[in-house]
A protein has these predicted regions:
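Hydrophobic alpha-helical transmembrane segments in multi-pass integral membrane proteins
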Residues: 346-353
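Alpha-helical transmembrane segments and their membrane-interface boundaries
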Residues: 169-319, 323-337, 341, 345-346
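Hydrophobic packing positions in regular secondary-structure scaffolds
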Residues: 1-180
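Broad hydrophobic/π-residue packing in well-ordered secondary structure
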Residues: 46, 59, 87-89, 107, ...
Length: 353
C-alpha cells in the first residue's frame, strides 16, 4: 500500500489517508520515501474541507526575475511531476506570490524577456484556511483550471486544480441533497440499520412535534368539519399543494444561494416574485378545483371556499419556501438544513389555518 501511495499525487494520497485510522496512517508513512512522507504529513495537518486539505504541492513556480529561456528549461524538467503545467505561478525571493502566466504566454514570449515582463500581476488566490465550497465557487466564477493557495503572508503553499474541485462540488451536492431530504448525514450502503436510523431520527422527531401542531389545529375545527364533512376530503389537496409549491421555491432558493446569485438588494425582489408566482399558480389550480367541485358535487359555495383556501395556501407556501433558506443563510446556518420535509410540515400548519 505504501508503494501505491508513493506513486500517487500528494493530494490524492492525503484523501485516502484521511479515511484511515491514525495508527494505520502512521505505519504507512514510515514505510514511504522520507521526502514524500514529509510532504504528505504537512498536508495532513490541514482540515479536510479547507483549501489546505485539498491542495497539492506538486506545481510549477518560477522566480519573477527568471529569464524566459531558463524558465522553459525549468518547466520541461518539472513537468513530469507537476499536477498541471498549463498555469505557472511567479514568486519573489521570499516565495511570495506575485504573478501568474499560462504556458502559452511563456512559449510565445521573447527568449530575452523575463517572467515579470510576461506575467499578470492580477492574481486571484485562496487562503489556506478557506472553505472548499468557497474555492469551488471562486473557480466556477472565474473559469479557472487551477487556483494558487497562500498563507496569511502571501507565501505560495500549493495549488488546487479543477479535478479536485469537481470532487468537492459532487461532495457538496450530495450533502445538500441529503439535508434537503431531512437526513443529518449522507447514508452509506455499508451503514447498519441502527446508524442509518440515527442519522434520520433527529429531523423525524422534530417533524413529529410539528405534526402535532397540525393535528391540534385540525382538531379545533372539529365542529365545522362535522357540519360540512365533504370539506375534510379536500384538506389533503390543500396541504399537499402548499407543500409542493413550497418545496419547488425552496429548491430554487437554495440553488441561488449556493451559486451566489442572491444578494441583499435582490432579496425583496425575490420575495415579491415568489409570492406573485405562488398567487398565480394558486389561482390556476383553484379555478381547476373549483370547476371539478361544481361539476361533480354541485356545491358552488364549497368550491369557492376550497378554491380560496388553495390560493392562499399556495401563495404563503411558496413565499415560506423561498424565504426560510434566505433567513437561515443570513443567520450563518446552512440553508440546505431547511429540508423538504421541514418546509412541507410548516406549510401543512399554514394550510390548516
Amino acid at each position: 500500500a505504501s508503494h501505491v501511495l508513493e506513486e500517487m499525487s500528494y493530494d490524492n494520497a492525503v484523501d485516502i489517508l484521511n479515511e484511515l485510522s491514525k495508527p494505520k496512517v502512521a505505519s504507512l508513512l514510515t514505510l514511504m520515501n522520507k521526502d514524500k512522507a514529509n510532504e504528505i504529513k504537512a498536508l495532513l495537518h490541514y482540515e479536510e474541507d479547507t483549501a489546505g486539505g485539498i491542495m497539492t504541492t506538486e506545481f510549477i513556480s518560477l522566480k519573477s526575475t527568471t529569464p524566459v529561456k531558463e524558465a522553459l528549461i525549468h518547466v520541461k524538467e518539472q513537468a513530469p511531476d507537476a499536477e498541471t503545467i498549463y498555469v505557472i505561478f511567479a514568486v519573489n525571493e521570499d516565495e511570495q506570490l506575485v504573478g501568474v502566466l499560462s504556458l502559452r504566454d511563456l512559449i510565445v514570449a521573447e527568449n530575452d524577456a523575463y517572467i515579470e515582463d510576461v506575467m499578470s500581476e492580477r492574481v486571484i488566490s485562496a487562503n489556506v484556511g478557506d472553505d472548499q465550497e468557497d474555492i469551488a465557487q471562486l473557480m466556477r466564477d472565474y473559469d479557472f483550471i487551477a487556483v494558487p493557495v497562500v498563507d496569511y503572508q502571501n507565501h505560495l503553499l500549493g495549488i488546487i486544480t479543477i479535478d479536485d474541485i469537481l470532487d468537492v462540488m459532487d461532495e457538496e451536492a450530495s450533502e445538500d441533497y441529503s439535508r434537503l431530504a431531512g437526513v443529518s448525514d449522507i447514508d452509506s450502503t455499508s451503514d447498519s440499520m441502527f446508524k442509518t436510523a440515527s442519522k434520520r431520527l433527529p429531523w423525524l422527531i422534530v417533524l413529529t412535534f410539528l405534526g402535532m401542531i397540525t393535528a391540534t389545529i385540525l382538531g379545533s375545527f372539529e365542529d365545522t368539519l362535522s357540519q360540512v364533512a365533504l370539506l375534510a376530503a379536500f384538506i389533503p389537496i390543500i396541504s399537499g399543494m402548499s407543500g409542493n409549491s413550497g418545496t419547488q421555491s425552496l429548491a430554487v432558493s437554495v440553488r441561488n444561494i449556493s451559486t451566489g446569485e442572491i444578494n441583499e438588494q435582490s432579496k425583496f425582489k425575490i420575495a415579491l416574485r415568489e409570492a406573485g408566482s405562488g398567487l398565480l399558480s394558486g389561482i390556476v389550480c383553484a379555478v381547476i378545483l373549483f370547476l371539478i367541485i361544481v361539476v361533480i358535487f354541485r356545491q358552488p359555495l364549497l368550491a369557492l371556499i376550497v378554491g380560496g383556501s388553495l390560493t392562499c395556501a399556495m401563495t404563503v407556501g411558496t413565499l415560506v419556501g423561498s424565504m426560510i433558506p434566505l433567513v437561515m443563510n443570513k443567520c450563518k446556518i446552512d440553508p440546505a438544513v431547511a429540508s423538504g420535509p421541514f418546509i412541507t410540515t410548516i406549510n401543512d400548519i399554514v394550510s390548516m389555518l
